């Protein structure tokens, strides 16, 4: 059962008061040390690490996560170990250290794959792919995105499918593979429509418009931008002014 300090930390976290949440989770860590409960200490340190990460206090967050990892390895909790490795990878991502982030993500893949935690593996492979892009490992990024799609399909993660298809489409586009980029971005658009995610749909359509523009397919480019402008208006997206200017310029060419 969570301690009173942990419960207070959770309350303040839900209220968005991260400073108070951090204070109470620090108290929870001290309580857990006093009671010599490894599981309680792991939980409290994990919560504290998460709050520190949200506060962009990266060094104390890493200290928490590393101690959590030691405890989880003692407890032999594979799924928890994988989650903490992902948290460490995310920290390195946030601090612009893609090589270290990649190393943590790869270790998490090795940990979670035998456990068949498909939902976590889908998200993890997407995270890994983004680091491969930062490291200019395009082929490795494409492979990781494709692996992510397989896991998203297994568990029916529509959000994951939509986002990953969009990311993979952008990767193919930047790599000069227009045909595969178009297929992925159309898939992304379909999934975003299914989810009712207008901003996501607009993002995929903007990339498609760029693709059609490079290809010289004026009609398809205009059609994509027409829909983007409609979404911009509906959701009051900040890209509206830029999108409408581009759309109107293209219409004048017709």
Q: What are these language model-derived features?
A:
Residues 213-237:
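TPR/TPR-like (Sel1-like) alpha-helical repeat modules
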Residues 3-14, 39-54, 79-94, 119-134, ...:
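Conserved alpha-helical positions within TPR/SEL1-like repeat arrays
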Residues 36, 76, 116, 156, ...:
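Structural signature of alpha-solenoid helical repeat scaffolds
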Residues 232-254:
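Terminal, low-structured helical/coil segments at or just beyond the last alpha-helical repeat
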């Amino acid at each position: 059962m969570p301690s009173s300090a942990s419960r207070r930390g959770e309350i303040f976290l839900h209220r968005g008061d991260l400073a108070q949440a951090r204070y109470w989770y620090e108290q929870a860590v001290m309580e857990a040390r006093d009671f010599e409960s490894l599981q309680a200490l792991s939980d409290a340190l994990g919560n504290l690490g998460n709050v520190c990460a949200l506060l962009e206090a990266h060094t104390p967050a890493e200290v928490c996560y590393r101690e959590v990892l030691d405890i989880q390895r003692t407890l032999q909790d594979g799924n928890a170990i994988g989650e903490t490795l992902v948290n460490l990878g995310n920290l390195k991502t946030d601090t612009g250290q893609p090589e270290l982030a990649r190393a943590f993500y790869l270790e998490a893949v090795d940990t979670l794959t035998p456990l068949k935690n498909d939902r976590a593996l889908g998200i993890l492979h997407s995270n890994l792919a983004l680091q491969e892009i930062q490291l200019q490992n395009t082929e490795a990024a494409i492979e990781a995105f494709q692996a992510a799609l397989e896991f998203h399909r297994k568990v029916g993660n529509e959000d994951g499918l939509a986002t990953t298809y969009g990311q993979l489409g952008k990767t193919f586009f930047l790599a000069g593979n227009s045909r595969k980029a178009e297929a992925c971005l159309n898939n992304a658009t379909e999934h975003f429509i299914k989810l009712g995610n207008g901003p996501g749909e607009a993002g995929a359509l903007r990339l498609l418009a760029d693709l059609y523009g490079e290809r010289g397919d004026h009609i398809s480019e205009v059609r994509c931008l027409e829909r983007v402008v409609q979404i911009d208006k509906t959701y009051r997206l900040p890209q509206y002014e830029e999108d409408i200017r581009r759309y109107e310029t293209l219409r004048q060419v017709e």
